């Protein structure tokens, strides 16, 4: 179906606004994936706070101009599904990675985070980023560990001091 100029401008404006507020973006090729599977992916994306859209490549090139995702321009070849993460930078990458494991025909092309393009082979860098809550939990565990270690060293020094006396 042909789009008129106003429709194209509306699509570019809408997706550009989403891109400006996004933390990361992932580009994939969904050729050969059934409609049912794509519907499941879109539902999971909505639950994870990920905006997904299939947009013509020429329009996508205009969408990413002036955004941190401009580095993805070369990946807009063939059928392109793009996902923008708003709540957590690794959400879209994690979603696409899990979906690609279950669907062999789904191919991740690349991702972008803070203006840096991440090739599909290195998508784990983005997908394994801890969430905010996970990062806080790790920090607290490290701090708790350090305090416990300091207590043990203090008690050992006190014991050594008493043995010496």
Curated annotation (Swiss-Prot):
Keywords: Ribonucleoprotein, Ribosomal protein, RNA-binding, rRNA-binding. One of its GO terms (biological process) is translation. Forms part of the ribosomal stalk, playing a central role in the interaction of the ribosome with GTP-bound translation factors. Disulfide bonds: none annotated. It comes from Serratia proteamaculans (strain 568). One of its GO terms (cellular component) is large ribosomal subunit. The keyword Ribonucleoprotein applies. Part of the ribosomal stalk of the 50S ribosomal subunit. The N-terminus interacts with L11 and the large rRNA to form the base of the stalk. The C-terminus forms an elongated spine to which L12 dimers bind in a sequential fashion forming a multimeric L10(L12)X complex. The keyword Transferase does not apply. This is Large ribosomal subunit protein uL10. Gene3D superfamilies: 3.30.70.1730, 6.10.250.2350. It holds the Pfam family Ribosomal_L10. GO terms for molecular function: large ribosomal subunit rRNA binding; structural constituent of ribosome. Belongs to the universal ribosomal protein uL10 family.
């Amino acid at each position: 179906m042909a789009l008129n100029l106003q429709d194209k401008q509306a699509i570019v404006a809408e997706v550009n606004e989403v891109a400006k507020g996004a933390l990361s973006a992932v580009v994939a090729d969904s050729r050969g994936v059934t409609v049912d599977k794509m519907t499941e992916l879109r539902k999971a994306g909505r639950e994870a706070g990920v905006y997904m859209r299939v947009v013509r490549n020429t329009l996508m090139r205009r969408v990413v101009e002036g955004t941190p995702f401009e580095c993805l321009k070369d990946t807009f070849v063939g059928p392109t599904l793009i996902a923008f993460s708003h709540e957590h930078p690794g959400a879209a990458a994690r979603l696409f990675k899990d979906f690609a494991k279950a669907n062999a025909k789904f191919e991740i092309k690349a991702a972008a985070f803070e203006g840096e393009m991440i090739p599909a082979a290195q998508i784990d860098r983005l997908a394994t980023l801890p969430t905010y809550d996970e990062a806080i939990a790790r920090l607290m565990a490290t701090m708790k560990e350090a305090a416990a270690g300091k207590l043990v060293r203090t008690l050992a020094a006190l014991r050594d001091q008493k043995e010496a006396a």
